[in-house]
Amino acid sequence: MLDERAKLLLKALIERYIADGQPVGSRTLSRASGLELSPATIRNVMADLEDLGLIISPHTSAGRIPTARGYRLFVDTMLTADRADIVTPELVPEQPQKVIANAANLLSSLSQFVGVVLVPRRTSVFKHIEFVRLSERRFLVIIVSPDGDVQNRVIFTDVDYSSSQLIEASNFLNSHYAGLAMEEVRERLKGEVELLRGEVATLMQAAVNIGTEAMTSAQEDVVIAGERNLLSVSDFSSDMGNLRRAFDLFEQKTQILRLLDFSSQAEGVRIYIGGESQVVPFEELSVVSAPYELDGKVVGTLGVIGPTRMHYDRMIQIVDITSKLVSNALSHKR
């Protein structure tokens, strides 16, 4: 258990290191802490903090830097609640894919690190379907999902359907099957085609087949923006090995997906420092994440990935604000 003096010195050391990235010596720490302590006393406290695994001494310097364990104690017990001056533009309610992409870019821009957003799992349930004639025997099928996602597909037919036939087909599908998964609609249609004229039934079956493919097709599971920002972070630009590992992590995405998926089960902002998540075993990276919602239900997670030497208070606010913006934008796109 740390006494108050040790806590103040650890807090001052971490804040100083976050600010300039240089190992902190006893003289610098004496000035930064504001405590009237002799350099010898400060060195003794720093030795105790090192024994506890909260700070370490790089071999190239007599100063100290925080460990992941030190950052964790700092984040859990020492962060101030001062509101940072963060100017965030509104995310305009529009198609979910655009909201997600804009959110990743916003996170990256505000943090100057990497913004990541876990994409909601696409559903094959449809809310509305409509047909538009493009030319002879060529039609546009417009499929709207319950979350406002719009899929447009062009189909070619052997029959040149009239406007009344297109309306008949869309009305039947919307009145009988809206709210069902496309796979279920396809099965039900097989037993109900005799209720409709043959040509219209064929059109509906073609629309449902292409709709099933469109709404369950492979999609990007996670959107990542700002990877190149790490090139400007001294913690990475000076170590090509770490930089290469970080870019491999972003390219493969698997570990990021697992971490964001796990984070969606938590309420509020979560912070993973270094390798403590055991999902992204990277001692030099930290992840600040938060879930976002659609109509009050958690549908995904977003966050910032950057060096362990980050302004955690600012990152927490950026992630928290962005999760609220995304939730509002998605829920208002109804």
Swiss-Prot record:
PANTHER family: HEAT-INDUCIBLE TRANSCRIPTION REPRESSOR HRCA
Alphabetical GO biological process terms: negative regulation of DNA-templated transcription
Entry superkingdom: Bacteria
InterPro entries registered for this protein in UniProt: GAF-like_dom_sf, HrcA, HrcA_C, WH-like_DNA-bd_sf, WH_DNA-bd_sf, WHTH_HrcA_DNA-bd, WHTH_transcript_rep_HrcA_IDD
Entry GO MF terms: DNA binding
Organism: Delftia acidovorans (strain DSM 14801 / SPH-1)
Family membership noted in the UniProt record: Belongs to the HrcA family.
One Pfam family, short name: HrcA
Protein name in the entry: Heat-inducible transcription repressor HrcA
Reported function: Negative regulator of class I heat shock genes (grpE-dnaK-dnaJ and groELS operons). Prevents heat-shock induction of these operons.
